[in-house]
């Protein structure tokens, strides 16, 4: 059977989307990828393509190859920026180039009749993140919520221009996390189960608004209920 596909495309936060234990020796936590697979079971396949440490500059090289070799993708997230928005270093991508890269990805997806969803970067707990990144900090490689907001706002503008949905995760984290927003992160940058749950909920909201035909509740369950299958299975595919 040929299932339609939902592509999750991005950096480490996408790569870790199925990780139920984001904290070593910790308890199982909510996993975005597993939640989506569960909700879309017998409706649509979830195709995860996340690349730890990658930027929009590098991701732009990968996306054409993914789309060339994967068939029947109908919807996709583009979730990049947490690396691009770094103040300096090999992962830093200037804002104009970053936006142009994302624009090219959106255009490429549209050429394949894929419905894009742009995701903005979340938040960063500098105190926790920088404890483990002393060498990077010494070189002047910083991530800040102020810069994340600049990149997120630029993505929101791009999404509006391209008439595609946008998820402002930084604002959702601030609203849902309140004074305890740091709990939405594991190491100060990557998401905890609580962070992924907010991501999931915001994602499903925009799907319901912009692409309602691909919201899980509106998609048809593939094949008959087992109670309706004849003993010999002869009516399964009818």
Curated annotation (Swiss-Prot):
One of its GO terms (molecular function) is hydrolase activity, acting on ester bonds. PANTHER family: ISOAMYL ACETATE-HYDROLYZING ESTERASE 1 (PTHR14209), ISOAMYL ACETATE-HYDROLYZING ESTERASE 1 HOMOLOG (PTHR14209:SF19). Homodimer. Keywords: Hydrolase, Lipid degradation, Lipid metabolism. Transmembrane segments: none annotated. Belongs to the 'GDSL' lipolytic enzyme family. IAH1 subfamily. Optimum pH is 7.5. Disruption phenotype: Accumulates approximately 19 times higher amounts of isoamyl acetate compared to wild-type in laboratory scale sake brewing. It catalyses: 3-methylbutyl acetate + H2O = 3-methylbutanol + acetate + H(+). The active site is at 12 (nucleophile), 187 (proton donor), 190 (proton acceptor). It is an enzyme of class 3 (hydrolase). Plays a crucial role in the hydrolysis of isoamyl acetate in sake mash. Hydrolyzes short chain esters from acetate (C2) to hexanoate (C6), showing more specificity for shorter chain exters. No activity for decanoate (C10) esters. It holds the Pfam family Lipase_GDSL. Its EC number is 3.1.1.112. Gene3D superfamilies: SGNH hydrolase. GO terms for biological process: acetate metabolic process; lipid catabolic process. The record marks 53, 83 as: Transition state stabilizer. This is Isoamyl acetate-hydrolyzing esterase.
């Amino acid at each position: 059977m040929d299932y339609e596909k939902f592509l999750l495309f991005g950096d480490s936060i996408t790569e870790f989307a199925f990780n139920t234990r984001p904290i070593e020796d910790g308890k199982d936590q909510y996993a975005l990828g597993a939640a989506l697979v569960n909700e879309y079971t017998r409706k649509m396949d979830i195709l995860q393509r996340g690349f730890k440490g990658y930027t929009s500059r590098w991701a732009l090289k990968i996306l054409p190859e993914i789309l060339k070799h994967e068939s029947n993708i109908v919807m996709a997230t583009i979730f990049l920026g947490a690396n691009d928005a770094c103040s300096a270093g090999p992962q830093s991508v200037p804002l104009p180039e970053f936006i142009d890269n994302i624009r090219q990805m959106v255009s490429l997806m549209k050429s394949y009749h894929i419905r894009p969803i742009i995701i903005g970067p979340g938040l960063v707990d500098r105190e926790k993140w920088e404890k483990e990144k002393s060498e990077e900090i010494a070189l002047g490689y910083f991530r800040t919520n102020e810069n994340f907001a600049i990149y997120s706002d630029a993505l929101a503008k791009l999404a509006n221009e391209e008439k595609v949905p946008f998820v402002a995760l930084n604002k959702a984290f601030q609203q849902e996390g309140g004074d305890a927003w740091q709990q939405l992160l594991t190491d100060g940058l990557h998401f905890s189960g609580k962070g992924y749950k907010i991501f999931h909920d915001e994602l499903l909201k925009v799907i319901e608004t912009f692409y309602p035909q691909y919201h899980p509740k509106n998609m048809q369950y593939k094949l008959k209920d087992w109670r309706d299958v004849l003993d010999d299975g002869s009516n399964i595919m009818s």
